[in-house]
């Protein structure tokens, strides 16, 4: 708990269940604090280690913070925009509101009504910005490049997880469900692995309630193909960077995605990426002389098979894309860069 009188930015989280938005807050706020930003969170479902304020502390929003004309309220959902509008416009509190939009779909009339009343809007990708009818600043997500980094020894990284160090591995990480394209990944591996005995595949992630049958069907499909010992379903892990470090190629097979951090996490670990053209993937993965991977059409199994094979069968290309991905994430996608860009938006409102 921190004294709201020492807080200039409030980051609300009004959703109890863990989501991508909540995860963004959890990862960003400590970095923002480390960079000197006077930010605190508000709401449930967040680690107690984060600096926070209480709802009853909001009474202090009538007073300006020292040296500033107002505070900033950084909303990421409709349910967080509405109370801020009421505090600012109805109660006349000293507040400016920022909204970050990650949605790649047409906004409802209600969402548009709220967004038009923001003092500043951030879009998490160029595609997201295209769905906004108001001026906005594009700030791509970043990742913790200290947490996601290559192994000192890939052989040892594989051994530590009980994997065969003599094999190369293709991975697909995230929730196991149709929307995430897990079935496309599995089917592509069923097509590719039989004639590539030196490769294996890893599916890391959890299937929840309605998706358990989907996962079971995929495992049955793998077993029928005689690949149960080569396409591994390892479940959900908290040490996911260790699993990236054991990979040689990563596939992001999503049919739909809001942003999608997994390609960045893979590239930061020195792993080339094959990704579908959804979310922000086409803005993260690059081709040409600085190739970090390949972008393919969504829901296209043949394209996925061909793209994965292009790396699996070309070791020099695989190695070059690995080095390029590492350089690209380090230069352009460190989470500190995201935090500084967001701070510039805050500053523009608190001058």
From Swiss-Prot:
Pathway: Bacterial outer membrane biogenesis; LPS core biosynthesis
Pfam families: Glyco_trans_1_4 (PF13692)
GO BP: lipopolysaccharide core region biosynthetic process
Domain of life: Bacteria
CDD domains xrefs: GT4_PimA-like
Entry GO MF terms: glycosyltransferase activity
SUPFAM superfamilies found in the cross-reference section: UDP-Glycosyltransferase/glycogen phosphorylase
Protein name: Lipopolysaccharide core biosynthesis mannosyltransferase LpsB
């Amino acid at each position: 708990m921190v004294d709201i009188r020492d807080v200039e930015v409030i980051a609300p989280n009004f959703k109890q269940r863990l989501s991508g938005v909540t995860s963004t807050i959890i990862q960003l706020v400590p970095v923002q604090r480390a960079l000197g930003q006077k930010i605190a969170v508000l709401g449930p479902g967040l680690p107690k280690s984060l600096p926070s304020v209480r709802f009853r502390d909001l009474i202090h929003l009538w007073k300006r913070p020292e040296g500033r004309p107002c505070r900033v309220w950084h909303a990421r959902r409709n349910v967080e925009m509405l109370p801020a509008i009421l505090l600012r416009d109805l109660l006349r509190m000293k507040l400016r509101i920022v909204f970050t939009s990650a949605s790649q779909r047409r906004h409802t009339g209600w969402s548009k009504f709220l967004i038009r009343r923001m003092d500043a809007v951030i879009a998490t990708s160029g595609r997201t910005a295209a769905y906004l009818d108001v001026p906005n600043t594009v700030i791509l997500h970043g990742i913790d490049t200290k947490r996601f980094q290559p192994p000192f020894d890939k052989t040892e990284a594989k051994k530590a997880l009980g994997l065969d160090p003599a094999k190369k591995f293709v991975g697909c990480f995230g929730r196991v469900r149709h929307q995430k394209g897990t079935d496309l990944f599995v089917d592509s591996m069923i097509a590719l692995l039989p004639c590539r005995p030196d490769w294996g595949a890893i599916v890391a992630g959890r299937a929840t309630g309605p998706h358990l049958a989907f996962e079971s069907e995929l495992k049955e499909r793998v077993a029928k193909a005689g690949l149960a010992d080569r396409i591994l379903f390892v479940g959900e892990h908290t040490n996911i960077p260790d699993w990236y470090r054991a990979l040689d190629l990563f596939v992001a097979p999503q049919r739909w995605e809001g942003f999608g951090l997994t390609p960045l996490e893979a590239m930061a670990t020195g792993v080339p990426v094959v990704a579908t053209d959804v979310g922000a993937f086409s803005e993260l993965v690059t081709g040409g002389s600085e190739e970090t991977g390949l972008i393919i059409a969504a829901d296209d199994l043949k394209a996925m098979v061909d793209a994965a094979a292009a790396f699996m069968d070309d070791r020099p290309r695989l190695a070059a894309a690995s080095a390029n991905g590492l350089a690209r994430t380090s230069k352009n996608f460190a989470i500190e860069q995201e935090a500084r860009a967001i701070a510039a938006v805050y500053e523009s409102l608190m001058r």
